[in-house]
Every structure is written in C-alpha cells, then in structure tokens.
Amino acid sequence: MDASFDKAAANYDDTFTHTAVGKMQRALVYAELSKHLTSVKNILEINCGTGEDAIWFAKQNFNVTATDISAKMIEVARRKASLNFQTADINLIAKVFENEKFDLLFSNFGGLNCLSKSELENFFATVDSILAEKGKLALVIMTKNTLWERFYFLAKAQFKNISRRKKESVLAHVDGENITTYYYNPKDIVNLANANFETVSIKPIGFFIPPSYLDGFFKNKKGFLRFLNRMEQGVKNTTSLSKYADHYLIILQKR
C-alpha cells in the first residue's frame, strides 16, 4: 500500500487538495470538526497525506503529530511545513505511540477505507489505549451507497459498476494506481467500534457536492458547483443522508 501512495504523492495536491471539489469537501469537514475541538490539545492524525490538515490544526494552535504510511507523502508534507510528520502504518499505530496520549485521533477522506474489516476491528480494539480519558476519534469515511457514483455510472452506461462499492473490496483508481479499497456505511463503523467507543455524531460530507473524480467535469461549471455547495449547506446536519454521501464524518468517544 505504501508504494502505491508513494506514486500518488507528487500529484495529490493538484488532483484533490487544491481542486474546487476538494476545497469544498474539506471546508465541510472543518466546519463540523471545529464543534468537537473545544477541549482538545494534542492531536494524532493518521493518513495525513501531504499534510494539509495537519497544517490547519497547527494554525489553530493545536499540538499535532501527523502520520502516513507513504514516505513520499511525508516528504511532500515536510516541504510544506515544519511540523511533526512521521511515517507510520495504521495497523501498528497503537504500538508506535504506546507511551503517548492524544485528545483526538483524526483520519480524513477515506484513509481508513484502506483497511479490511478485520484490520478495522483491530484498529478499534487497540487505538483507545493511546487516547486520553474521553478522547475522540474523528473519521471521514467513504460510504457504500453514494448516490453520485450511482448516477455517474448510470450516465456512462457502466451498469455493472453502479453498485461496486457494495462488494467486499474494490480496486479504486488513485493517480494511475489501483488501490484495494473497502467501503463502510456509518452503521458498519458504529458496530465495529461499539465495544470501546460511543457514537457522538455522524454527518454527510458530499451529498450534493460531487466526488473529487468529477472535478474536471465541473471545472467549467463553477456556478453550478457553487449552487451544489449551497444545497449541501442545507443538508449538512442531516445524519440520515450520511450513507448516501461521498463521505461522512463520524465522531466517536472513548468509553
């Protein structure tokens, strides 16, 4: 997995971070996440990519440690800011930081979708050990039922792909690389995490705002994209739409 994301590192900001869709989806995450940061001081980010979120946290005066399995992603992040960026595997994260405690563990835009169900079970079974009392997880995860993708494949007459996210795993295309990806609806995460975490909130990210792979289509339709963004603002607190969005933000608190 690390080598695959190494190849994506050089172009990741251009193909997602700095796109109009990427900025809109990230703004949604920040607006909701900010509601849960009042008692937070120390943050651990996993799957930090090129460091965009770690830089945002640092600008809010949080102590942030940001990790990614891809050494190339970490190289790009370190060129952008002098923060505590480290190469680390999600599956070993509780071991790597066994002597530390964090108030918040954050994973943005589908980082945890790289984990199989058994790996995700292990993550939830162990990660509470590095969280402070009442510490939280803030996780942005890709769903099984996103309507945008269904409409996209229907329009392209690719009928066999309409429900592809419901398969056990899918090879997702990321900057020329095929990444094994697992999709989880909110209920899946609630059930997997329930032993050690209680659910605080679940909010849709990208119900009207399209997935990032459609940014090119909307490049010359900025007015329509702004309209979709306004529509998004009207449903951003509607939990029931979360499993139909591109992503959702789930906040879990350590029991």
Regions picked out by a protein language model, each given a short descriptive name:
Residues 50-93:
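Class I SAM-dependent methyltransferase SAM/SAH-binding core
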Residues 121-133:
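A short glycine-rich, Lys/Arg-flanked "PGG" loop and its adjoining helix->strand segment in the class I
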Residues 95-104:
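A short acidic, Gly/Pro-enriched loop at the edge of an enzyme's catalytic core
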Residues 201-255:
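A C-terminal cap/extension of S-adenosyl-L-methionine-dependent methyltransferases
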Residues 178-196, 202:
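Short alpha-helix
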Residues 1-38, 40-49, 56, 138-165:
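Conserved class I S-adenosyl-L-methionine
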